[in-house]
Amino acid sequence: MVAFLSAWPWENFGNLKYLLYAPLAAQVVYSWVYEEDISKVLWCIHILIICGLKALVHELWSVFNNMLFVTRTLRINPKGIDFKQIDHEWHWDNYIILQAIIVSLICYMSPPLMMMINSLPLWNTKGLIALIVLHVTFSEPLYYFLHRSFHRNNYFFTHYHSFHHSSPVPHPMTAGNATLLENIILCVVAGVPLIGCCLFGVGSLSAIYGYAVMFDFMRCLGHCNVEIFSHKLFEILPVLRYLIYTPTYHSLHHQEMGTNFCLFMPLFDVLGDTQNPNSWELQKKIRLSAGERKRVPEFVFLAHGVDVMSAMHAPFVFRSFASMPYTTRIFLLPMWPFTFCVMLGMWAWSKTFLFSFYTLRNNLCQTWGVPRFGFQYFLPFATKGINDQIEAAILRADKIGVKVISLAALNKNEALNGGGTLFVNKHPDLRVRVVHGNTLTAAVILYEIPKDVNEVFLTGATSKLGRAIALYLCRRGVRVLMLTLSMERFQKIQKEAPVEFQNNLVQVTKYNAAQHCKTWIVGKWLTPREQSWAPAGTHFHQFVVPPILKFRRNCTYGDLAAMKLPKDVEGLGTCEYTMERGVVHACHAGGVVHMLEGWKHHEVGAIDVDRIDLVWEAAMKYGLSAVSSLTN
């Protein structure tokens, strides 16, 4: 049975919970449109604005927290936040709705207070002093006492406070993630100083806005998992150790739970003899080690941006959005101009940066981002700059001791760098293994084709992947219709096949040659007209970037080749572009397998057809699994 006040009344509403703000918004709109006077509903406007500011504070702290390229050396808990924690904290903003409802009810039940709020001055120095006094003498001790009680009483901790502590890695969103009862108590803790100021006649809008926003700001600070304070600050002014907590201070509370119960002021932990003795030493240690090299990743996936809209799928933009497969969202459109400007800035000044990470069997796996977008790879004058970025990333990985670096999508474009061959030839003494991952990509596509298929139509047939697929299938006795206008390139591939299988490779120059073939392997973009040649019931396997559009309703379409990471992956909380949770592109998975196997060779240039089955079996051995890509 659910404990009293442990669940939220709108728990099953989903995003419809935001309609609870509607009465306030409706009140404002009605007064503005029909009464042409909003002075009587200023309190509604203030509530809505403050709620928006509170949400913005959490979002900005989340952005900062997830900027690993800025915060990685100052992180307190080095673990990553996984999908389970993100889902657990999905409705972290319930408390903001609760506060809006409580304040609205108070205003409705107390018309004098409502009128007082509508006529508050912008600033009152006495009110600021009263606010500080009330916070220190009421809010801090009340919170400390109740927080400690929730920990020491087994019933209250088990049924209430454990919900907050079930997030293994502190995050700004963790700050608001608690039960209904705890947030009602927090409303009292944060509300009494504000109500007190108003009742004393010294309230002001600055006090209300400032305290409401700073209260959440400080809560996010304590949960941000990034030590932002310099240890020198507390050495120069030791008194600050009693007046303000640090992210390290509160992280120790989440790790050990029996100490550091204060709201914002460690003074009350000192008075209650509950301060963790390592609080300030650990804080100093983290700050001093900020310039030192942290753990070196065993594997790096070198990715790049696709387009401006998908750039907002980054975890340091909206964490919840990044934890779901990418789709274009209307609410992101207003951010497009700003993101476009950021893209231009990245083009001019940015270097390869840490994007995300996870751990697999004690191997640290990171994704680094090349600050370039898809269209830039097709600009002739941008080629050198892109290769310089990729080369710098490879050399950096080699210098710090990375074992394997895998090139994503366009970073291994044949015309750009020969599938990574350029870098391996230029730096023959590389210790890091450079991998394009296309061997596993080919394996995923090939193992998806039913065994009873005896004919396929292949576009992009003379590309690196197309060549490998054609040679593999012809050995299997499958007739491969290779779409290419180049007789020379076709014959070159045909000669690589064993003599007895060469007749299985057939050159075709037009799409109508495949009008009776129901298995299409697409390595080149198809227009609706070109797709129309496929007979009903055709399945389009594909390795073209970006994927072809699904025009045919009587056909099925495969997604890009992908694999699901093993179940024991830890700290994974970001979806890779349009992939489902825990699923990565096959070239990414290929690099992981290369690292796990400890292979010492570079996988660049042409795909070794003889290794396709070997790489597939290795992937299966480590628990990676093929992803069914059959979609209508």
UniProtKB/Swiss-Prot annotation:
It catalyses: a long-chain fatty aldehyde + 2 NADPH + O2 + H(+) = a long-chain alkane + formate + 2 NADP(+) + H2O. GO terms for molecular function: aldehyde oxygenase (deformylating) activity; iron ion binding; oxidoreductase activity. It is found in: Endoplasmic reticulum membrane. It is a multi-pass membrane protein. The chain crosses the membrane at residues 13-33, 41-61, 96-116, 127-147, 184-204, 298-318, 330-350. Gene3D superfamilies: NAD(P)-binding Rossmann-like Domain (3.40.50.720). One of its GO terms (cellular component) is membrane. Its main location: endoplasmic reticulum. Disruption phenotype: Plants show postgenital fusion between aerial organs and severe male sterility in low-humidity environments. Altered cuticular waxes, but no effect on cutin load and composition. Its EC number is 4.1.99.5. It comes from the Eukaryota. Coiled coil: none annotated. Expressed in siliques, stems, flowers and weakly in leaves. Not detected in pollen, seeds and roots, but expressed in lateral root primordia. Specifically found in the L1 layer of the shoot apical meristem and in developing trichomes. Keywords: Endoplasmic reticulum, Lyase, Membrane, NADP, Transmembrane, Transmembrane helix. One of its GO terms (biological process) is pollen sperm cell differentiation. InterPro entries: CER1-like_C, Fatty_acid_hydroxylase, NAD(P)-bd_dom_sf, Sterol_Desaturase_Related. Residues 133-274 form the Fatty acid hydroxylase domain. Involved in cuticule membrane and wax production, and in the typhine and sporopollenin biosynthesis of pollen. Core components of a very-long-chain alkane synthesis complex. May be the fatty acid reductase responsible for aldehyde formation. Interacts with CER1. This is Very-long-chain aldehyde decarbonylase CER3. The lineage of its organism: Eukaryota, Viridiplantae, Streptophyta, Embryophyta, Tracheophyta.
